[in-house]
From Swiss-Prot:
GO terms for molecular function: acetyl-CoA carboxylase activity; ATP binding; carboxyl- or carbamoyltransferase activity. The gene is accA. It comes from Staphylococcus aureus (strain JH9). Its main location: cytoplasm. The lineage of its organism: Bacteria, Bacillati, Bacillota, Bacilli, Bacillales. One of its GO terms (cellular component) is acetyl-CoA carboxylase complex. This is Acetyl-coenzyme A carboxylase carboxyl transferase subunit alpha.
Length: 314
């Protein structure tokens, strides 16, 4: 339960208590239950239509929030995962492969968090090593060769900052991806589905179209990190989240992303299938908007997008 959801938790407890009493004592409490359920719906709408930036940060970090592998079966047909960077090893924090979107072969790449403690250790909490970014680039170059559109799912706190990752060239692997992605001659469409953290997000985020789920975040540093750097106090993360403009609607207003995809009431985890279908619809629409461009025009469109990205507000 998140802090701002406490009023909802209390109403749900009352509903469960009344239902239990109704079953145990064979009394009719349905009218009271109906009133509380109506109150719960009203309060849920009120809370989720007035979320603060820090509230959205908490939602983006939820353990139960859908991951790349949760969405893929609903969006793409016959997905086949491909492994390895052909240099060092496979990185489970970065998944990729080939699937079909409405009958068309596409390449799918995404950061992958774990679903529980054991899985998170295996997936390194969604923080990819250099071999993860090199695997992603290998699949992107393969997609370019076979003229397959590329779809990427961004969901990471950042690239892994450990000693071994640095020794194997973490910064070089991300920098190379930025250079190579800028000139790919096939459509690239990216979506931030959770946290989009720093260079770790950009390593698969240089796209013709960049989308965000409405409760996702996109930033150069975490609010806690920014607060520690700016004010020497990580406890001021809530203020930092508001100052940094890291939420989807703020970033859309700044011209950094192309579209915001709505989430089910309560967040994407409340209805994964509904959320996935909304993403699929956006993917199809964005891909259609690029169909008239030649291969050279697609690369130039992406290059110019990032040359002119963002805005300055005094």
């Amino acid at each position: 339960m998140l802090d701002f959801e406490k009023p909802l938790f209390e109403i749900r407890n009352k509903i469960e208590s009344l239902k239990e009493s109704q079953d145990k004592n064979d009394v009719d409490l349905q009218e009271e239950i109906d009133m509380l359920e109506a109150s719960l719906e009203r309060e849920t709408k009120k809370i989720y239509t007035n979320l603060k930036p820090w509230d959205r940060v908490q939602i983006a970090r939820l353990q139960e929030r859908p991951t790349t592998l949760d969405y893929i079966p609903y969006i793409f047909d016959s997905f086949m995962e491909l492994h390895g960077d052909r240099n060092f090893r496979d990185d489970p924090a970065m998944i990729g492969g080939i699937g079909f979107l409405n009958g068309r072969a596409v390449t799918v790449i995404g950061q992958q968090r774990g679903k529980d403690t054991k899985d998170n250790i295996y997936r390194n909490f969604g923080m990819a090593h250099p071999e993860g970014y090199r695997k992603a680039l290998r699949l992107m170059k393969q997609a370019e060769k076979f003229n397959r559109p590329i779809f990427t799912f961004i969901d990471t706190k950042g690239a892994y900052p450990g000693k071994a990752a640095e020794e194997r060239g973490q910064s070089e692997s991300i920098a190379t991806n930025l250079i190579e992605m800028a000139s790919l001659k096939v459509p690239v469409i990216a979506i931030v589905i959770g946290e989009g953290g720093s260079g770790g997000a950009l390593g698969i985020g240089i796209a013709n179209k960049v989308l965000m789920l409405e409760n996702s975040t996109y930033s150069v540093i975490s609010p806690e990190g920014a607060a520690a750097l700016l004010w020497k106090d990580s406890n001021l993360a809530k203020i930092a989240a508001e100052t940094m403009k890291i939420t989807a609607h703020d970033i859309k207003q700044l011209g950094i992303i192309d579209d915001v995809i709505s989430e089910p009431l309560g967040g994407a985890h409340k209805d994964v299938e509904q959320q996935a279908l909304a993403i699929k619809s956006a993917f199809v629409a964005q891909l259609d908007s690029l169909e008239s461009l030649s291969r050279d025009e697609i690369a130039n469109d992406r290059f110019e997008k990032f040359r002119n990205i963002g805005s300055y507000i005094e």
